A protein has these predicted regions:
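Thiamine diphosphate
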Residues: 1-126
C-alpha cells in the first residue's frame, strides 16, 4: 500500500524531471526536516538552499516563476509562511491579473510536530 509520503516523493520526482523545475527553501539541499526526505532523489543542481528569510524566499520564488521556471518553494512550518504574506498576497496572488502571465510557484508547507523534539510554541502553532 502506498503512503502519503510515497506519493509526495513520486510527485517531487515527476516535477524534478522537467528541465525548468527548481526547489527553493530551507533544508532542501541539506536534509533537516521531514519535507527534505521527499526530495532525496532530486539532483542538487535543481536546489537553492536558503537561510531563514521567508519573505525573501517567496520573493525569489515569485521572480523565478516569472521567468517560466516551475518553482517548488519549501516552508518547513506553516507559521513561517505567514512571514512571507506580503510577497504571497501582494505579488504572487496578483501577478496574473497585473501582467496576464502565470507565475508557476508551488508552495509546500509542513505542519509542526512535537516528536521527537518539542520545538516550542513558535513552531507548532497548529
Amino acid at each position: 500500500m502506498k503512503t502519503y509520503k510515497d506519493e509526495l516523493i513520486k510527485s517531487m520526482n515527476y516535477l524534478a524531471e522537467k528541465p525548468n523545475t527548481i526547489f527553493v527553501g530551507q533544508q532542501t539541499a541539506y536534509a533537516g526536516n521531514p519535507m527534505s526526505t521527499t526530495i532525496l532523489d532530486v539532483s542538487k543542481d535543481k536546489m537553492i538552499e536558503t537561510p531563514v528569510f521567508e519573505e525573501v524566499q517567496m520573493g525569489m520564488s515569485v521572480g523565478l516563476g516569472m521567468t517560466n521556471m516551475c518553482v517548488i518553494t519549501f516552508y518547513p512550518r506553516w507559521d513561517f509562511l505567514i512571514c512571507a504574506a506580503n510577497q504571497l498576497v501582494n505579488h504572487l496572488d496578483k501577478f496574473k491579473h497585473m501582467t496576464g502571465y502565470d507565475s508557476h510557484v508551488i508552495i509546500r508547507v509542513g505542519k509542526g510536530s512535537d516528536d521527537p523534539l518539542d520545538p516550542g510554541v513558535q513552531h507548532k502553532a497548529d
